[in-house]
Amino acid sequence: MAAPRIAHLAHKSVLELSGPDAQKFLKGLSCKDVEYLAGGYSGFLNASGRVLHTAFVFPRSKNSYLITHESPEDHPAPLTSLLPPFKLRSKVRIKDVTSQWDAWSAWGSDLQGGPSPIRTWKMGSGGASESHWDWEGGVRDLGLRDDEVGCWDLRAGWPHMGRQLLIPKGEKPSLATSHDLGNMDDYELHRMLLGVPEGPTEILPGHALPLESCMDIHGGVDFRKGCFLGQELTVRTYHTGATRKRILPVRLIPLDQTSSSSISDLLSSSPQQSLDEVSTPLDITYHPPSSSATRKPRSAGKILSLHNAVGLALVRLEMAERCWWSGDILRSSVSQWLDSGAGRLTTQVNGKEWGVYVGQGEAYAAALEHMSSSS
């Protein structure tokens, strides 16, 4: 078992909402109930239901909240600019407090023996799947100092993503005594392997849809709460639409692989070939099987981010199902797979063609299992 790790998320900004109307104000704008499970994953949409920000909300009291988010200089709607126009006469103060707090993530702890949350699913139409968590007897204590703030990160089940933390600026987290100090690369690889998209590179502001961005299965959207900005399209899609694409984990497969090892063994090992710096997004192409009446390649999605040969991609689910999720193709070697005439997904990286394996990620796999057992 890998040692637990803790990493500073230096790219995250921190916003504070405070005042008598802070709770009401936040409830009208965020797509998750701000009091649910004492904080957690949420987001902010535009009026047409497109994602502008994913965020973590940390309630400090009924009248005070801290929010971590990513608003780089090229963001079309920074959170510090998005929220103030909605204040009107609300008694709420909006303040950037990034200079006061550092965002951290801690994962990999042995949490056996204590209280564990229970996940249930509420299913919509066309593949929409709302993840809902409950703690019997109250939310488990995070084990933090009094001056630290945190919440459980349940995007990829329990306890895979561990804790999201806010630590007073420049101070060492108390959990650093029981966790190895990691870095941003460790955090990025960890969440990518679990199929957890995050931030404007992967969830494109003003374009990405909540369900395609897996905010439903990661517990970031509440389809039954009161009105919030962007609710109409989101709820309508949940009840009557179809989710044909999702952001899922991918692994690049070298097509010149000569090993007799199975693709399954290849996927479970560390990448043997490192990639030079790669500019994303990258187009994914679907090549129909040799038995298909139509052999013309088609677009299957885009790779949004890469960490060496591991990444996240917005993929057409139908094509991932055809290529990877049915049959025994994972037992084949790469050469057997290519010779079989089976359908496949590929991409071009720096002029070289690679195979693209699409995984389901923790949350989508759990949702599919629930749908299968309920049918």
UniProtKB/Swiss-Prot annotation:
Q: Cellular component per GO?
A: mitochondrial matrix
User: Any keyword Transit peptide?
Assistant: yes
Q: Which Pfam families would you find in this protein's record?
A: Beta-barrel_CAF17_C, GCV_T
Q: Which InterPro entries match?
A: GCV_T_N, TrmE/GcvT_dom1, YgfZ/GcvT, YgfZ/GcvT_CS
MF terms (GO), sorted A to Z: transferase activity
GO biological process terms, alphabetically, are: iron-sulfur cluster assembly
User: What family does the entry list?
Assistant: Belongs to the GcvT family. CAF17/IBA57 subfamily.
Q: Which PANTHER family match?
A: TRANSFERASE CAF17, MITOCHONDRIAL-RELATED
- From the Swiss-Prot or TrEMBL record, give the protein name: Iron-sulfur cluster assembly factor IBA57 homolog, mitochondrial
Instruction: Tell me the name of the encoding gene.
Output: CAF17
Question: What organism is listed for this UniProt entry?
Answer: Cryptococcus neoformans var. neoformans serotype D (strain JEC21 / ATCC MYA-565)
**Keyword terms, alphabetized:** Mitochondrion, Transit peptide
Does the record carry Oxidoreductase as a key word? no
Q: Which NCBIfam families match?
A: ygfZ_signature
